[in-house]
Amino acid sequence: MKVLWAALVVALLAGCWADVEPESPLEENLEPELEPKRELEQEVEPEAGWQAGQPWELALARFWDYLRWVQTLSDQVQEEVLSNQVTQELTTLMEETMKEIKAYRAELEEQLGPMASETQARVAKELQAAQARLRSDMEDVRTRLSQYRGEVQAMLGQSTEELRARFASHMRKLRKRVLRDAEDLQKRLAVYRAGVREGAERSVSTIRERLWPLLEQARTRHAKVDALATQPLRERVNALGQQLRGRLEEMGSRARSHLDEVREQMEEVQAKMEEQANQMRQQAEPFQARLKGWFEPLVEDMQRQWAVLVEKVQAAVGTSPTTPPVETK
């Protein structure tokens, strides 16, 4: 991983470093015989290649558009330059751009976990240098506007065509420098972001490669532990089931034996009761005969007395004799 980041930093240093080119004396001192109107009316060439996507790029695009409007040197621009409004607006846009660049850098640096600290410090230093160059260019624009404002105020009532021509030329150069350093910073941040993404992907891949065998081992070990833990439990359950089954069978056999004993005892009791009943019946028959012998004479005597009584009653009332009651046997 360290070798990868080292190669990435070398490529960044070799391919993206761009020093600010000093302006030539010829560009600093334009010949006064240049045609002022031609310089003022020359259209600003479009900046192909600049693509705004990140917040800092959008902020820089607003700075760029405002600077292009200032370069037109229209009457409104002249009024706002003299009132210091242009300088204030450029300062606001510049600070906003620097703030967005700083926030974007901080966001990328938070994602640099896999990068070595030495490599991270080197890359951060290069980004800081590119950011400083862009800030210097933007401050040069603001300084040049302040100088132009002072020169215009000093030449009130005089022709400022030559002054405006020089200012327009300087603004074109400054805009080119801003564009060049902005593109340089954009490339460095793109390489920085690509390195962060690649490092994160490699880290995830490395973690997956390292963790997958460990996960497989853990899964296999867990399966073995489950098997070992389940086997004794199953054997224990089977043993308990057999013990319970044996006890139930033993209790059932005991219950059946007890029922058989109870049944035998009941049969014995029943037999004894029948025997006793027969004995009592046999013993009662002589007693019954004896009682019958005792009461039959009394009954016959009572029947005779009843018949005599009835005859007397009939004779007294003069009715036919009534048949005496007959004992039903």
Swiss-Prot record:
Q: Which residues bind heparin?
A: L174, R175, K176, R177, G241, Q242, Q243, L244, R245, G246, R247, L248
Give the signal peptide as a residue range, or say none if absent: 1-18
SUPFAM superfamilies assigned to the protein according to its UniProt record, in alphabetical order? Apolipoprotein A-I
Region feature LDL and other lipoprotein receptors binding, mapped onto this chain: 170-180
Pfam families named in the record: Apolipoprotein
Lipid-binding and lipoprotein association: where is this region?
222-302
Could you tell me which residues carry Methionine sulfoxide?
M155
Q: Which GO terms describe its molecular function?
A: cholesterol transfer activity; heparin binding; phosphatidylcholine-sterol O-acyltransferase activator activity; phospholipid binding
Q: Where is this region: Homooligomerization?
A: 278-329
What are the start and end residues of every segment in region (8 X 22 AA approximate tandem repeats)? 92-267
Residues covered by region (Specificity for association with VLDL):
290-302
Please give the superkingdom of this protein's source: Eukaryota
Q: Which keywords appear in this protein's UniProt record, sorted alphabetically? A: Chylomicron, Endosome, Extracellular matrix, Glycoprotein, HDL, Heparin-binding, Lipid transport, Lipid-binding, Oxidation, Phosphoprotein, Repeat, Secreted, Signal, Transport, VLDL
Q: State a GO cellular component annotated for this protein.
A: very-low-density lipoprotein particle
Assembly notes: Homotetramer. May interact with ABCA1; functionally associated with ABCA1 in the biogenesis of HDLs. May interact with APP/A4 amyloid-beta peptide; the interaction is extremely stable in vitro but its physiological significance is unclear. May interact with MAPT. May interact with MAP2. In the cerebrospinal fluid, interacts with secreted SORL1. Interacts with PMEL; this allows the loading of PMEL luminal fragment on ILVs to induce fibril nucleation.
* Function comment: APOE is an apolipoprotein, a protein associating with lipid particles, that mainly functions in lipoprotein-mediated lipid transport between organs via the plasma and interstitial fluids. APOE is a core component of plasma lipoproteins and is involved in their production, conversion and clearance. Apolipoproteins are amphipathic molecules that interact both with lipids of the lipoprotein particle core and the aqueous environment of the plasma.
Q: Which PANTHER family match?
A: APOLIPOPROTEIN, APOLIPOPROTEIN E
Q: What is this protein called?
A: Apolipoprotein E
Species of provenance: Arctocephalus gazella
Q: Which gene encodes it?
A: APOE
